[in-house]
A protein has these predicted regions:
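Conserved donor-binding/catalytic core segment of Leloir-type glycosyltransferases
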Residues: 252-256, 261-285, 291-294
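Nucleotide-activated donor-binding/catalytic signature segment of Leloir-type glycosyltransferases, i.e.
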Residues: 310, 315-335
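Short hydrophobic beta-strand element within catalytic cores of glycosyltransferases
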Residues: 349, 369-372, 382
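Aromatic "clamp/platform" in nucleotide-sugar-dependent glycosyltransferases that forms part
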Residues: 352
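Conserved acidic donor-binding segment of nucleotide-sugar-dependent glycosyltransferases
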Residues: 384-385, 389-396, 404-410
């Protein structure tokens, strides 16, 4: 008689599933694990959002009534003042990731009320989880969406190697003090992590190597499992399908962009796509590099249409002679995003650091080649001159050349792009890897 397989209960924790790459990635993994049904059952626990059968929210576990709202407001104000005092010596940074409010004090109780065998952490900052509240009697999987888990205070360490030691004198804090905030937070993480059964997952080989070299995670169980996406949603469409969609699109700007992109060969300018959420304020997004590359192309008389989503014209000053610029604003509709990917001849992702970019994966799955710098996890997804172009790091001239190369080989490289994503990043492929990990840890 076959032995009954016990279902492994997984609680996946992320601050939200609606905004940001980490939330989208976490939700896709959650859905995938439940879909493949290989002995694992995932439930999500989020800070903000709407409660569903498989999604619990922190609000469900907070005290109800006006007294709590008022008390929470007062305590938050006090804690914010303390937080500002902590950060005041470090004027160079605007990072507020270590703020916490009264809600954090209810989290431990909320976690204890959940039934699970494995706790799966994703992105837990923004006043959500205090590491000292993590359970010491359960295996914890922590998927790295940036470097904060193994750094003192930094989400992106850039050229700093302090995380390989004990942090301190943090360049991102503008500090020369070896016992600065980054060192103090590092010590607290070290104290807590030594009590936890941590298993680290990195979506990219690059970040996994960084984690292995870090003083906080050295010697830990560190594995590489990529993020995933629904390749049935993010898929290529024919030119005729794009034209039909454009005719029924209520957004006049998007409709025009799609119609222009599908004109007969010789009439349509190549379409360069750029996603620019927070690009003006976040230098990590690499907008300065993109601007330099486009200026190089413009001086060469290169004609193209640049389509920007996620930012407005007032956010990004773009003015060229030969390259027209269209802003389509913030795109919350996934289907609309898919059509934009399909219309593009190339998507440019000029970020200065990347783990495993959702935008790159989504565009590749739609059959759109990528031009990006050869940094971080980009090389895991983009194969140079096969499904995109890996420009030399910080070399804007090479980035400009890569944009031209992607446009020239758009059809050929786009087909290879789609094939690579289906093979490595489809939901069932990735979910099975996580299901096997859960089973291993829950024995």
């Amino acid at each position: 008689m076959a032995q009954e397989v016990r279902e492994i209960r997984v609680l996946s924790v992320v601050d939200n599933i609606g905004n940001g790459g980490a939330g989208r990635a976490a939700y896709r993994i959650h859905l995938g694990v439940n879909a493949v049904a290989q002995g694992g059952r995932s439930k999500m626990f989020v800070k903000a959002g709407r409660a569903q059968e498989d999604i619990a929210t922190l609000a469900e576990f907070l005290p109800k009534g006006r007294w709590f709202a008022a008390f929470d407001w007062v305590v938050s104000k006090i804690k914010n003042k303390i937080q500002h005092a902590v950060w005041r010596p470090y004027k160079k940074t605007q990072d507020k990731s270590f703020k916490s409010d009264l809600r954090g004090t209810w989290l431990n109780g909320a976690l204890q009320k959940q039934e699970y065998d494995v706790l799966h952490l994703h992105w837990i900052n923004k006043r959500f989880i205090r590491i000292e509240d993590l359970p010491k009697d359960k295996p914890i999987v922590w998927t790295l969406h940036d470097s904060w888990p193994f750094c003192g205070t930094c989400h992106y360490f850039l050229d700093c190697k302090g995380y390989q030691h004990e942090c301190g004198s943090c360049p991102q804090l503008g500090s020369t003090n070896p016992n600065d905030l980054s060192r103090r937070v590092w010590k607290e993480k070290k104290r807590v992590f030594d009590q936890l059964d941590l298993h680290i997952v990195s979506p990219s080989r690059w970040l996994a190597d960084c984690a292995r070299q870090s003083s906080l995670f050295a010697g830990r169980d560190i594995r590489v499992i990529p993020n995933c996406l629904d390749t049935d949603v993010f898929r290529p469409f024919s030119k005729a399908e794009i034209v039909e969609f454009a005719e029924h699109q209520q957004n006049a700007v998007v409709s025009r962009v799609l119609r222009e992109a599908t004109q007969e060969k010789g009439l349509a300018k190549p379409l360069i796509l750029y996603g620019a959420a927070n690009a003006a304020s976040d230098r990590i997004k690499g907008f300065a590099s993109l601007l330099s590359a486009l200026q190089i192309l413009d001086k060469q008389g290169f004609e193209a249409n640049l389509v920007v989503f996620g930012a407005s014209e007032t956010d990004l000053p773009l003015n060229f002679e030969h390259i027209s610029v269209t802003f389509v604003g913030f795109v919350s509709d996934v289907n609309l995003l898919v059509w934009l990917y399909n219309a593009a001849d190339v998507m440019v992702v000029p970020s200065l650091t990347e783990n495993l970019s959702c935008a790159i994966m989504e565009a590749l799955s739609c059959g759109t080649p990528i031009c990006c710098f050869n940094i971080g996890g980009n090389g895991d997804m983009v194969e140079h001159q096969v499904n995109g172009y890996l420009a030399r790091e910080k070399d804007c001239t090479d980035l400009a050349h890569g944009i031209q190369e992607c446009i020239t080989h758009s059809a050929e490289w786009g087909a290879a792009a789609r094939e690579s994503v289906v093979k490595k990043y489809a939901v069932d492929v990735v979910a099975k890897q996580y299901s096997n990990l859960y089973k291993e840890l829950a024995r």
